[in-house]
């Protein structure tokens, strides 16, 4: 498959199984579908833009705001444990995570970032619940106006992308479940 096989106006459209045409059908999420969104508190002014963009994109595609539960944790390091508990609860079809890990000069931020991403991957593989990461680790981050503006805008993009990935993955899993029985 190539990238054009997945493109359409709706982020959770999928190709008809067994169809040779390029016709796409939209698979809305079941009404009982719930999604958890976890956000870290560090750099909340920046990270909250990712949450806002995620919620706006989900709303744009018909997902009610009351179908998304919001959770806030102190830092990115706390995200994987919360993601695991939420995924294990059986209440959520997906868990979306948003945070910013920066080099504060005291510890190796790349170790923290690696632990977070590895933890999130483990959660989804162990539980079967998809976990999406908008946990970003910039190579260089300084709290001056240029970086603050750039990352504030970048989280808008990442929040929207997380919503689209979430919708596409849930639709794909729904389709796969129907095919596999």
Q: Predicted segments — roles?
A:
Residues 71-89, 136-137, 141:
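Glycine-rich oxoanion-binding loops at beta->alpha junctions
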Residues 36, 69, 78, 93-95, ...:
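Structural motif
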Residues 78, 82-120, 124:
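Glycine-rich phosphate-binding loop
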């Amino acid at each position: 498959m190539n990238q054009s096989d997945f493109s359409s106006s709706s982020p959770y459209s999928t190709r008809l199984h067994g169809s040779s045409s390029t016709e796409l059908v939209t698979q809305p999420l079941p009404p009982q579908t719930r999604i958890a969104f976890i956000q870290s508190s560090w750099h909340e002014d920046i990270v909250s833009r990712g949450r806002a963009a995620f919620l706006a994109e989900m709303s744009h595609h018909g997902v009610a705001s009351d179908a998304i539960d919001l959770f806030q944790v102190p830092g990115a390091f706390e995200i994987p444990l919360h993601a695991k508990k939420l995924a294990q609860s059986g209440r959520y079809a997906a868990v979306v995570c948003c945070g910013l890990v920066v080099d504060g000069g005291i510890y190796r931020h790349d170790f923290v970032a690696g632990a977070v991403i590895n933890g999130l991957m483990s959660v989804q593989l162990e539980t079967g619940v998809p976990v999406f990461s908008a946990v970003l680790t910039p190579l260089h981050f300084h709290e001056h106006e240029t970086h603050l503006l750039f990352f504030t805008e970048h989280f808008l993009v990442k929040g929207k992308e997380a919503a689209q990935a979430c919708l596409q993955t849930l639709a794909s899993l729904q389709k796969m479940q129907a095919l596999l029985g």
